[in-house]
Amino acid sequence: MSRTTTKTFFSGALALLFGFAANIALAAEGDNFVDEASAKGIAEIETAKMALDKGTSEDVKQFAQKMIDDHTQANQKLAQLAQQKNLEMSDEATLMDKAKAMILQLRDGENFDEAYANNQVVAHEQTIELYRDYVEGGDNPDLKQFAQQTLPKLEEHLKQAKELQANHGQQN
């Protein structure tokens, strides 16, 4: 992939991802937070599965497995909490559709590792923003506690994603 193509690819991807930033304002409501956080978790899991399949670097694959493990666990806790608190949660198909809309069309080979690393930085920055916004202005104390407890792991993921980006990704 040429530099121009890569920049165009990431510009389009960023435009798509920033479109979801408008939804963050809705995150103050518990149901909306549950849906957005779940969809972002599913997107993390699905892109990580792609990285295990298409990635070429061992560090990318190790990071991807960690994303699958950690985000599966977080989504399970979130679903359990939503059920306990009688919060409405979109069905799995709707959440998967939201997640798919967040997933970049990642490329094969070396460029896949680059695209995945760059995607993970942006995705984790947005997820951290969603969780921080809920901690600061959310309406459900239990969800606020979940968000607060999950933030350190998300921040750790962002740090690791930035390390991957330094090794494999495009730096702007």
What role is predicted for each listed range?
Residues S2-N172:
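His/Met- and acidic-residue-enriched segments that coordinate or traffic transition-metal cofactors
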